[in-house]
């Protein structure tokens, strides 16, 4: 299957048994989501060859579809289920027979919470029950579905106020309202911390068992395959490279990722950022005075990769924004060294804070690239960097090489649009977009939030290489201790707005509480 010149899937041959839980494992951009959308059958694909054949049982009287084992049984309308085949490639998108099958397939889309944000949780599920039953509303049915996904305790909450994991479970409850014969789960826990992901996985596992569903789940986390599937597929560049027992497929995927060399001790310079008794307080209607950062004193050295770690709400993002000059402190002092001069970051103006911030860069977790402009445009004109073309091309290639592309890869990437790149490639281009402005201090906010293992290793190498090649100082905000251990020279552990320890990543790890370990260490 192609999108323009890009071949998203090729030579995919796969059979899925009724009642089976199949996992599709692969790095970002390997074609997992595309394959799931093809199997769902509700979108037209212009350049697709081959067949996608469903073997089901269908009632000729009312067109209701059930799994193939129901053939010969009586339908609720009084008819009898007959064996039936539907090929989603040959049947048109609006063909009634194709729609009969596709409406019996539920899907949880990657990073998409299809909820009515202003409605209560129970109303969201009641609406799904109404849609599935053709107009009949059942409060009890909706409540049962919330029980199924362990969300009864949030029944009266407004949907937009739920956490990511809670929203994902409400989405699952809405899909279960269809009483589906198959569930397609596309990275259902890809953006969640390990503890929350476990809750979502348990809800999925329970629903599959209770509803006797066939399930296909995609992930870039090997452990998900082992926990939730009977059989797994390893997908790479749109091709199936291996099928088999989940633990073996997970092992092959980990082997593909390779590893980062042991962190080397690096000579760093003198302090470049210094803060003393730094505090930031907010006023909250329901919580009163919130001490987001509470009397923090800290030094970061030039050329150092320094980690700010802690659970959600510990204060690390607020602290990083103050150190970067984005947020002003309530009290305390921050200074940044420019050359031999110390600049007071609490004094506004081009001769004070502005003198330091022009040498700072920040890559946000939710970074954006201009999707319809080439990579070289994203690295130059789009960010206000006006250079003669030859110099712009040379500087762009040099920066792309710094973040991990080979020179040949960099030359090819320059003319592509971001949507032609994998997630890992886009992340490296976004990092190059920050580095090409020649900052002295770079803040990375949750740089590995949704990354697969292979992409995470690519980005780890990019950070280490950028420090070695360009002499940058990195401040990394993260709750991913695996990543912090791979790249950081030192780290500060934050808890309730305070720094409780500064030292090596291993030293920080030894002082973490059980709750911190559950959120910050991979499962």
Where are these regions (language model features)?
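Q-loop/switch helix immediately C-terminal to the Walker
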Residues: 119-131, 373-385
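The feature captures the beta-strand-to-loop junction immediately N-terminal to the Walker
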Residues: 25-27, 309-311
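Conserved ABC ATPase signature
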Residues: 158-162, 166, 417-421
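Catalytic Walker B motif of ABC-type/P-loop ATPase nucleotide-binding domains
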Residues: 183-186, 442-445
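Helix-to-loop junction immediately C-terminal to a conserved catalytic motif
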Residues: 40, 324
């Amino acid at each position: 299957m192609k999108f323009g010149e890009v071949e998203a899937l090729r030579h995919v041959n796969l059979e899925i048994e009724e009642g089976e839980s199949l996992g599709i494992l692969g790095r970002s951009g390997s074609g997992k989501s595309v394959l799931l959308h093809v199997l769902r059958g509700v979108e037209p694909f212009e350049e697709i060859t081959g067949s996608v054949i469903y073997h089901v049982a269908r009632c000729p009287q009312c067109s209701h579809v059930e799994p193939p084992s129901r053939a010969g049984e009586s339908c609720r309308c009084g008819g009898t289920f007959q064996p039936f085949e539907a090929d989603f490639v040959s049947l048109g998108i609006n063909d009634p027979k194709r729609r009969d099958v596709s409406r019996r397939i539920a899907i949880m889309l990657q990073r998409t919470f299809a909820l009515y944000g202003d409605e209560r949780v129970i109303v969201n599920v009641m609406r799904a029950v109404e849609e599935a039953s053709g107009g009949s509303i059942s409060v009890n049915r909706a409540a049962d579905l919330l029980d199924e996904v362990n969300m009864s305790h949030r029944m009266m909450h407004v949907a937009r106020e739920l956490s990511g994991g809670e929203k994902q479970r409400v989405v699952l409850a809405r899909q279960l309202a269809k009483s589906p014969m198959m569930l397609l789960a596309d990275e259902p826990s890809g953006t969640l911390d390990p503890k929350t992901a476990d809750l979502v996985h348990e809800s999925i596992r329970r629903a599959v068992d209770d509803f006797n569903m066939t399930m296909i789940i995609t992930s870039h986390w090997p452990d998900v395959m082992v926990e939730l599937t009977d059989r797994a597929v390893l997908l790479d560049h749109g091709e199936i490279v291996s099928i088999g027992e989940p633990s073996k497929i997970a092992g092959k995927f980990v082997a593909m990722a390779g590893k980062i060399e042991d962190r080397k001790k690096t000579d760093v310079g003198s302090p470049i950022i210094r803060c003393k008794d730094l505090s930031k307080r907010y006023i909250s209607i329901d919580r009163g005075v919130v001490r987001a950062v509470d009397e923090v004193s800290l030094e970061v050295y030039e050329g150092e990769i320094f980690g700010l770690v802690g659970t959600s709400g510990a204060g690390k993002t607020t602290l990083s924004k103050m150190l970067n000059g984005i947020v002003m402190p309530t009290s305390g002092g921050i200074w940044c060294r420019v050359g031999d001069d110390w600049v007071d970051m609490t004094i506004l103006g081009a001769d004070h804070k502005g003198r330091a911030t022009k040498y700072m860069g920040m890559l946000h977790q939710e970074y954006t690239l201009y999707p319809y402009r080439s990579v070289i445009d994203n690295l130059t004109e789009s960010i206000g960097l006006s250079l003669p073309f030859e110099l712009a091309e040379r500087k762009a290639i040099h920066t792309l090489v710094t973040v991990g592309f080979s020179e040949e890869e960099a030359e090819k990437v320059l003319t592509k649009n971001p949507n032609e790149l994998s997630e890992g490639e886009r992340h490296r281009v976004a990092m190059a977009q920050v580095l090409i402005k020649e900052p002295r201090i770079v803040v990375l906010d949750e740089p590995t939030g949704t990354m697969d293992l292979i992409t995470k290793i690519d980005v780890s190498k990019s950070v280490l290489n950028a420090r070695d090649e360009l002499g940058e100082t990195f401040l990394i905000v993260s709750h991913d201790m695996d990543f912090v251990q791979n790249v950081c020279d030192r780290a500060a552990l934050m808890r309730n707005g305070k720094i409780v320890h500064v030292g090596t990543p291993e030293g920080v790890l030894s002082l973490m509480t059980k709750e911190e370990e559950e959120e910050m260490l991979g499962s």
